[in-house]
């Protein structure tokens, strides 16, 4: 409908949106297809997923829709829309796609990623992240998600705050948290 365009950022993906296609597929489908391939060709007992920033957002979404991901870890990945007044937290096209979030908002996704047999969803935020989702705003929803997950009698949700550095990264401290959660 627009002719040829050169996509140079996530925000321009909205130009590809049609009634029958969503670019959200570019984020989700490769992971689902990979898990399908692994299940067909190997005999793994479980799947875990870790992502930072846009990868943390992808981790949240994919874990919410595919229960085969038993443990998922989103580092500096997302806040609910009501906590995104700071422009650095608003995110790219995929993080505020209204059609997607009419189906399930962020709080719904956090619960969906958490519940189920042997399922766990962990968010890690960097206290002094220069990019996005730094600080303690998660405290606005953390207890509500924990309480909601408990009503399902199976599943686990937790948030960690990493104050050991001032970068937009998965620090050694966060890696230790992830490792400890996986083996616990």
Where are the language model's segments positioned?
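C-terminal catalytic histidine-bearing segment of alpha/beta-hydrolase fold enzymes
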Residues: 144-184
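Structured alpha-helical segments in the cores of large, soluble enzyme domains
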Residues: 27-36, 109-115
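Primarily recognizes the serine-hydrolase "nucleophile elbow" in alpha/beta-hydrolase
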Residues: 32-94
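The feature captures the conserved acid-bearing segment of alpha/beta-hydrolase catalytic domains
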Residues: 80-153
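Alpha-helix capping and helix-loop boundary segments enriched in small/acidic/polar residues
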Residues: 18, 22-25, 50, 97-104, ...
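Flexible loop/turn segments at secondary-structure boundaries
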Residues: 56-59, 79-83, 129-133, 165-170
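Cap/lid segment of the alpha/beta-hydrolase catalytic domain
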Residues: 1-29
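Non-catalytic cap/lid and distal C-terminal segments of serine-dependent acyl enzymes
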Residues: 30-36, 65-67, 74, 167-184
